Amino acid sequence: MDKDKRKELMEAYKQIKVYMGVYQIKNNENSKVLIGTSCNLKNRWLTLRMQLESNRHPNARLQKDWNDFGPDSFSYEVIEQKECKDIVNINWELENMEKEWLEKLQPYDDKGYNKKLMQ
């Protein structure tokens, strides 16, 4: 690859906006949700779906429902996002965003797939 082409590709890559934030996977059959965060929301659903389709997702209750209801019964939605470039401490920011949504939606027990964390 010549220098000009490489430079052009690098500039194009720098222009791609990467968003971090909070997502939910929703079981549309029983309305249960899983709340999670990612520093790359665009790629997160691909990873989650691959785990679920290969029966390797770490959340056993979500995996069971995925197997029982099928992939067409689930949806992925970004519920809050921020552009990464202006964030100093991404992990801290994601943790706080997730805490807010967990508090708001309470996706535990019959309402969801998240586990309550001990405070």
Labelled PLM ranges:
Residues 2-35, 39-119:
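Structure-specific nucleic-acid interaction/processing domains
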